[in-house]
């Protein structure tokens, strides 16, 4: 029988529910259990695919092409699993599906209501997360905080799950803030008590509290919360601020969190062996060397817009025994006049993805600087497309070369829309999304990075492609297409072999990076940056 764990939040948002859920997932996986995890987002958007990165941070793409919340990146990196489209559910997605069924007459003329139709659809997503992965445990995080109007159908669905599958198969974990008032010199439990009261008013009694705090709470505070919130004292778990998020699973294990969960759910599983994870964390905290990477982006004010890129760089730093110092460079501010001085201190330059015109000329200046000064450079998605445009302008001398996305009237559309996308007007869900194979060119830097594999599979999120009409011109000047689709129609990876490392990929390598296994192309880039720093 599959077990279901529901993680809710109270008092404030952004309290770290996702890290708590991911940490628990890692602990249960290391006990030998098969775990999957999902995020419920109560907003009305179908998915975050068309949301501004300033609103929501990065869009995380799964193998099957779902555009999802950035928390899924945490889940995959912590637990080292690949999730699917059932791992991110929004209000908009649920209502869209229910309304589509209503229009088709699938409800046989019934009055369609929040209960049972919306709640049943939500429960179906929870159960499908289990059946599509054959998991022992499903962990579901609900976004927002208890008391939000938009969360009510989600919490009702969670309440009903207990009756549907039995109390021994369901566990509710509530994450709250335990504020510390410096003036009074004490921690305040009332916000947590009121949050639990609100949750109980909706029919959910939490089985465990996870309290986010800056200072150790002490047993007295835990006993007080246990008494007034009706949970066992040992089931009040501290989530202290830490130097690195990968410390959290170890802190949770030290407090017996995973054992309490297993006892409640009657899971007979051996203790989690966290030796490898602990060694990784110890290494992260004791790196002596630092490598400076300039990240040239258009959303650099919000670092979460590049969360997976940053994590992949850190993982690659770990693989190369170096800490990564990210220099956040706003592409909008880069010009031909200031690019050399702005990037002079960089050991390596990364140009990540993005959409739209803003900042593209600055990114092109950064790419040109990297090429002309032989600074290791990695381009990703739009970064790959702009790498091609920069080469066309300054090496092939195709003045005005551009992407048809950025300049529909360009004489040289180096990047053009995919043929099957020409008549599509909707923006959402119309990209090339998900896992696709890439055939690597033997002897190339890309092939070397991937251990000379013939084919790798990586996730994509883009609409435009390199225009193969220009391929021969590029190759005549030493530009190598080192990764292509198996049918040779789509250009996936490009590089200049005479440079230390000048490689760009149309796909998003960062989605495959894990703390205990850095993504290979990122790792090769950081290796080159480390060498460049010497």
UniProtKB/Swiss-Prot annotation:
| Ligase as UniProt keyword | yes
Pathway given for this chain reads: Pyrimidine metabolism; CTP biosynthesis via de novo pathway; CTP from UDP: step 2/2
Record-linked PROSITE patterns: GATASE_TYPE_1 (PS51273)
Pull one GO CC term from this UniProt entry: cytosol
Q: Which residues bind Mg(2+)?
A: 71, 141
Listed A to Z, the keywords are: ATP-binding, Glutamine amidotransferase, Ligase, Magnesium, Metal-binding, Nucleotide-binding, Pyrimidine biosynthesis
Write down the InterPro entries for this protein, in alphabetical order: Class_I_gatase-like (IPR029062), CTP_synthase (IPR004468), CTP_synthase_N (IPR017456), GATASE (IPR017926), GATase1_CTP_Synthase (IPR033828), P-loop_NTPase (IPR027417)
List the residue ranges of the region (Amidoligase domain): 1-267
**In what way is its activity controlled?**
Allosterically activated by GTP, when glutamine is the substrate; GTP has no effect on the reaction when ammonia is the substrate. The allosteric effector GTP functions by stabilizing the protein conformation that binds the tetrahedral intermediate(s) formed during glutamine hydrolysis. Inhibited by the product CTP, via allosteric rather than competitive inhibition.
Q: Which residues form the active site?
A: 381, 508, 510
Query: Where is CTP bound in this sequence?
Result: 13, 148-150, 188-193, 224
Membrane-crossing segments per the record: none
Q: Tell me how this protein assembles.
A: Homotetramer.
Job description of the protein: Catalyzes the ATP-dependent amination of UTP to CTP with either L-glutamine or ammonia as the source of nitrogen. Regulates intracellular CTP levels through interactions with the four ribonucleotide triphosphates.
Q: PANTHER family from the xrefs?
A: CTP SYNTHASE, CTP SYNTHASE-RELATED
Report what the protein is called: CTP synthase
Q: What is the lineage of its organism?
A: Bacteria, Bacillati, Bacillota, Bacilli, Lactobacillales
């Amino acid at each position: 029988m599959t077990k279901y764990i529901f993680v809710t939040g109270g008092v404030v948002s952004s309290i770290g529910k996702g890290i708590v859920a991911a940490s628990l997932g890692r602990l249960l996986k290391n006990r030998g259990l098969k775990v999957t995890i999902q995020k419920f987002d109560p907003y009305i958007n179908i998915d975050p695919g068309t949301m501004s990165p300033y609103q929501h941070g990065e869009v995380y793409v799964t193998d099957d092409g779902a555009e999802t919340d950035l928390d899924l990146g945490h889940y995959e990196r912590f637990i080292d699993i690949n999730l699917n489209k059932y791992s991110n559910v929004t209000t908009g997605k649920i209502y869209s599906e229910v309304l589509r069924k209503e229009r088709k007459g699938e409800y046989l003329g019934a009055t369609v209501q929040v209960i049972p139709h919306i709640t049943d659809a939500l429960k179906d997503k929870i159960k499908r997360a289990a059946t599509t992965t054959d998991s022992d445990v499903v962990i579901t995080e609900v976004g927002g905080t208890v008391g939000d109007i938009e969360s009510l159908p989600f919490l009702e669905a969670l309440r009903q799950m207990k009756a549907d599958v039995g109390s021994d198969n369901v566990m509710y974990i509530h994450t709250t803030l335990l504020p510390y008032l410096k003036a009074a010199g004490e921690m305040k439990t009332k916000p947590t008590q009121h949050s639990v009261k609100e949750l109980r008013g909706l029919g959910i009694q939490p089985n465990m509290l996870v309290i986010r705090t800056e200072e150790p709470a002490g047993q007295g505070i835990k006993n007080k919360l246990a008494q007034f919130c009706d949970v066992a004292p040992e089931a009040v778990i501290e989530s202290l601020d830490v130097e690195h998020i990968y410390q959290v699973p170890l802190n949770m294990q030290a407090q017996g969190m995973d054992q309490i969960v297993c006892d409640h759910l009657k899971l007979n599983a051996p203790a989690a062996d966290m030796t490898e994870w602990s060694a990784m964390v110890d290494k992260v905290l004791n790196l002596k060397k630092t490598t400076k990477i300039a990240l040239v982006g258009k959303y650099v004010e919000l670092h979460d817009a590049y969360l997976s890129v940053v994590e992949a760089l850190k993982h690659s730093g770990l693989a190369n025994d170096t800490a990564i110092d990210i220099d956040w460079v706003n592409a909008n501010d880069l010009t031909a006049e200031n690019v050399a001085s702005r990037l002079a201190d960089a050991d390596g330059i990364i140009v990540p993805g993005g959409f739209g015109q803003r900042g593209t000329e600055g990114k092109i200046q950064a790419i040109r600087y990297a090429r002309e000064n032989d600074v290791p450079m990695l381009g990703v998605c739009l970064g790959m497309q702009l790498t091609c445009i920069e080469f066309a302008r300054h090496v092939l001398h195709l003045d005005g070369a551009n992407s048809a996305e950025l300049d529909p009237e360009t004489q040289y559309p180096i990047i053009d829309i995919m043929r099957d996308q020409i008549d599509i007007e909707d923006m959402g869900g119309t990209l090339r999304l998900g896992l696709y194979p890439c055939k690597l060119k033997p002897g190339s830097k890309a092939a070397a990075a991937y251990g000379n594999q013939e084919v790798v599979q990586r996730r994509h999120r883009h609409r435009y492609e390199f225009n193969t009409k220009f391929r021969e011109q590029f190759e005549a000047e030493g530009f190598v297409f080192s990764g292509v689709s198996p049918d040779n129609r789509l250009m996936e990876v490009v590089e200049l072999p005479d440079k230390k490392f000048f490689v760009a990929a149309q796909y998003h390598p960062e989605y495959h990076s894990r703390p205990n296994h850095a993504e290979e192309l990122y790792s090769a880039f950081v290796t080159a940056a480390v060498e460049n720093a010497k």
